[in-house]
Amino acid sequence: ENTSVKFVCTDGARKKAPGRRLAWIPIVAVAAFAGRPPRAADVDRFLVVAETPDSPGLAIPTVASSFGSFAEVADAVNAERERVAALEARLASLEKRGAEPLPAPAAKDKAAAANAKDAKDDKGAKKDDKKPADPYEIGSDKKLGSTWKDGFQGESANKDFRVKVGGRTQVDAVAFSAGPNLNQPPNQGGLDPELADTVNFRRARLRVEGRMYEFYDWACEYDFVNQINVNNEVYPTERDSGPLTAVTDLWLQVREVPWLGIVRVGNQKDPYGYEHLTSSRWLNFMERSFAQDAFEGPFNNGFLPGIQILNSNEEGNVGWQIGEFKNATNPFGFSNSSGGSMTVGRLVYLPVFEDEGRKLLHLAVAGRTMEPRRQYTRFDSTTGLPIGDPITAVRFRSRGDIRNGPPGPLNSIYADTGLLQGTWQNMMGLELVGNNGPWSFQSEYFGSWLYNARTTSAGPYLTNGYQPPPGTKVGTVFYQAGYAEVLYFLTGESRTYSKLEYRFDRPVPHNNFYAFRDGGRRIRVSEGAWQVGLRYNYLCLNDSGVNGGVLNGCTLGLNWLLNPNARVYFNYDCTYRDFSSTPWKKDGTPGTSYDGSGWVHGFGTRLAFDF
């Protein structure tokens, strides 16, 4: 029944203020004594007062109304506690023997109910794991479902088949300022073509890639704005150059080959250089370093026909790549030279790799050993046909950090050795890369040795520096290059990392950029991702009397990532060119020496998107 009662404190406070009600406590306050055995003083401290007109009681239903005293309440609570303790002991005994836990009681506590459901789901999942898998024939499910995964993609339910169609477009706008020596005619040490403000497409590619029968991957990609010089051995002219479709990736690979890993055959990037292996879709700056242009991919767009093996240890912190390639000097994926075989290898170690690469330290060494490609050095001025016998020769040259034209031979050349004959070439590369949240660091060093080198009658080019007289033996020629760069995401993103080729992967903004008016005509904006970067760049093509020039450059970059597939670059670059040219006369005597040294300042912006 409902009991109207009052509890009034009668301790010392009541004695100090007789007749004053100090506290009103409902009967449920008896729970305060449930945690310990009752004491006589507890009852003495409370006085049950009958309801009076000037002091009404609180009429509330209570669970304690059936108890006659606090002692009875305490006894009931203690009995309940003993029962709970017995249940807990029983539960522990059952769990120790591996039995199923007791079902959770229906409780008002949602968290307890959720935990019980999770335990039940886990138990069901373990039972499902023990069931034998339904028999499935690889390749039997050819139905593809479409989705968007950084591009349009169709994939089967069992992932045996996949087709992805995409591409990339990069449009540049650049402006330059250069010292007077660099604006001289090219046969007097100046740049050729002369630097000029330019708008052009840097890349425009279409790509189709996919998977078939689970273990076979393939890729086909073509570049539609690549410039090609049909006479690569001579100084390029507009007559010999034009925009022609060139192949980049065109390969088939087999995955999970025992003891080998992945075996890839076709036109592809050879595993030499971190920057080289990183896709142009998410380069840190508008252009790769001087080292890339001079050593890693001159004249072939960075892609070579060959075979490559990619593998790693079980933990994935050690990876290796090795391959045999043809040293082609054209972007069409073929070589008709009897020389130019090239063996390339790369070994990577990740002493630190945490949080899927958001914190990592990457150390690697790469090497190339090759016979220079056999090529002709003289051509008929009327027919353009080669004259004489081909020789094994190499040309080292580099363009600027900001380009003044589409890719190909018509860009201004900053450093150039001319054509050098040699019997063998070895190259070495060192990589040091770090990532820590929004911060990233990237650096590489390259060295190249050309053995039994001698100058050729094909030199000098109009763009090359000083060479000794044609036919002069200069022994082993050593050239080197390197760069170091630091980048920081202002909006807190972190670089992603791929363990397939051990390089940075696509960065993803926390929030995509947008700007629109809502229903209240207020402008809503999301910033996308913003990244700043600084790079120092170095190239030395001076050695053994062959002086192709020395370049020191500094690039400041600001990258705005609108979404994972679109970004805008802003680059400012200043490069100092240390260069001199000595054209040779027809009688084999040196002509006048010209100084082509000076500063080049360039500003470039690029809108790049891929799909």
Label for each model-derived stretch:
Residues 1-19:
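N-terminal secretory signal peptides that target proteins for export/translocation
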Residues 5, 12, 27-29, 62:
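Serine/threonine-rich, low-complexity intrinsically disordered segments
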Residues 38-170, 176-184, 235, 494-518:
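N-terminal periplasmic/intermembrane-space "pro-region" immediately following the signal or transit peptide
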